[in-house]
């Protein structure tokens, strides 16, 4: 095994700079294959790499080859299988488990022991040894001894050093010079000893010969040391001299440092003083303006504004650390605070006086607007107050409590002022709308009957308001009283819903203009006030309130909440919300007054809701385009809901009145009242809603109304006793069709076609029903002829039937001479004239249809005679031309 180890070292490991430490002859467990060797090696160069190498003998058996190598650090477990009994098997756990069988247990133990020592030395006990004897691993040996053992092993490994080529060559030369070296080793050793003695003697003589030179060298060294001592003495003297100079230089340096430090401190102190003087010194002119400056003139306001800005800058200056500890700074800050408080009180007091004065000045102008439908102009007041806008901004940032108090006072004064102005404005609008004067208000104190008489008396003297009639009285109308369907109302104070038919176009146009004038006056008033509030109270620049707001009192003295007109408290989260809340409080009377005006307009004429819906929708749309969340947009939107509700109520009332309408049992029906009402409504609506934004609402109303008209026309026609059902249906649907054709309402195209179809169907039905059988006996005769033909008798053979021969035919024809026919047609014309109404003018249409139907029957009889009685020469005693002449003369005679 030693020879194999030396061979492997020489052939495989030495070329790779490796040393072989241990070797074991193994084969794989369970397989009968050639043996191989597992070798434990280390590299000769650092860092040391430890490997386990598998070496296999070549197939020819003359040399070894390296098959595979594993780094020892990759070895996880060494399993000896049995720690007590001798067992040549062992496992090495690399990336997978390798099972080996050693040629002997001793070789296995020696190899495992080597692996253990390498693990102790290079891997810091990383490998786990399983089923290995404790004696083998030297666990009983202390750590120090273990290290010595490991070191000894390394030394044992180092005992063997292979000769290099030069050493081998020298040994060979020496041995060639001594032939006896091999035959007589003792002689060779003795020779070597003698040569060694000769060499030692030569070395001693050489040393003794160099003694003189050594003495000379020692003498030179002594002289050099003496020179060095002298130089050191001179250097010491120089050092003492330099030490005094160093002390003087240190003193000068320290003095310069102190001078520089003093200068630096002086510069910094001057800078701090200049900073405080420049930033915390308020000019005397500013102080005077704050204490007693004029707050009336523009120049005085400008001076106060500049002084307030300068004061704010001085108070808001960012002091450097330590400044607030200075007594002068504290005194100056206290002086600034006193100036701020004093000026804030002066400013708040002055502005409160301005608000009060404005209320008195505006009140004096109310009389001028009491007879005109205009609102007083607040622009001069806004213009004067806007001069204080910058001061209000200053007050807001410095003393929010006084700022909020001014806001509350402004809202209180202005809300009362606007309430008076707006109520007077709406009173004028109501008077112009109803055509009354202020004196009519005193009628409210009169008894109901006396008030009604007074109102009727005024209407007889030319009052422009025609407040008569009630749409709720349709159920009391008769066809005969269609010219005067409505009863007069008792008074303005007790008005019901007015009928649109009693108000002419001029009255409705007047209402439209008044309502538009009201909205046109309110809109700029609200926008101007909102713009003024935004600019004067500086609420448009920041979205969030300052932190100080939460500490200030609100407009009502509590937390920062605003109360809507509905009574609920709303938190103000932004300045935009605050503007809206201020507008709500200032103009809290606008929405109720608008609703009252709308209610009055609806009472005067329910059709006024059409005008109001269009106008209000347009103004809401305009306001929302400017600011959807503004007070004006919200208020008009709420009022629009009321207007839309009134519009829907108007439609519902019309449908209800259709259902409640009653007709006279003694007179002909004619055009039903609600059909005429629908025509009036549609014509008015089309003129109002032309290019309007709410066209969709009108289309929905059209659909509801037309369905109600169709249903109730049929209902009335079924209940009619005096007028035939077909006449009622024909006349009313003809009127509806004519109305829809004239107005060209796109959403009612299907209903227009339906009305035309119903008119046509009932016209045909009425013609057939009224015409009946004018030639009754002749008609019965030919019905019998047609019955025989239907039974299978040929037409030309019918004349051979006893009851239908030529003689019977001539007998029947003689009973209807032209004179009798004309008399029958004349009676029919009178009957139709009695059924039809003059309003629709359908008499000639119906008469022409009857003429066509009579001619059709005549032609039918002529055809039967020609087919069933060919060559008989039998003909009617009157011709088609006679029929045309009869009908024409009858129509002209009436």
Curated annotation (Swiss-Prot):
- UniProt-listed Pfam families: Sec3-PIP2_bind, Sec3_C-term, Sec3_CC
Any Gene Ontology biological process: membrane fission
In which compartments does the protein localize? Midbody, Midbody ring; Cytoplasm; Cytoplasm, Perinuclear region; Cell membrane
- Which residues are in coiled coils? 152-199, 205-259
Record-level GO cellular component terms: cytoplasm; exocyst; Flemming body; perinuclear region of cytoplasm; plasma membrane
Note down the stretches annotated as region Disordered: 437-495
- Residue ranges annotated as compositionally biased, kind Basic and acidic residues, are 438-459
Query: Which residues belong to the signal peptide in this entry?
Result: none
Q: Which residues carry this modification: Phosphoserine?
A: 470, 473, 487, 501
Keyword list, A-Z: Cell membrane, Coiled coil, Cytoplasm, Exocytosis, Membrane, Phosphoprotein, Protein transport, Transport
Q: Where is the composition biased (Low complexity)?
A: 460-491
What are the Phosphothreonine sites (modified residues) in this protein? 471
Chief location bin:
other
Q: What protein family does this chain belong to?
A: Belongs to the SEC3 family.
Q: How does it assemble?
A: The exocyst complex is composed of EXOC1, EXOC2, EXOC3, EXOC4, EXOC5, EXOC6, EXOC7 and EXOC8. Interacts with EEF1A1. Interacts with SLC6A9; interaction increases the transporter capacity of SLC6A9 probably by promoting its insertion into the cell membrane.
Q: What is the purpose of this protein?
A: Component of the exocyst complex involved in the docking of exocytic vesicles with fusion sites on the plasma membrane.
Q: What is this protein called?
A: Exocyst complex component 1
Q: Which organism is it from?
A: Mus musculus
Traced from the root, the source organism's taxonomic lineage reads: Eukaryota, Metazoa, Chordata, Craniata, Vertebrata
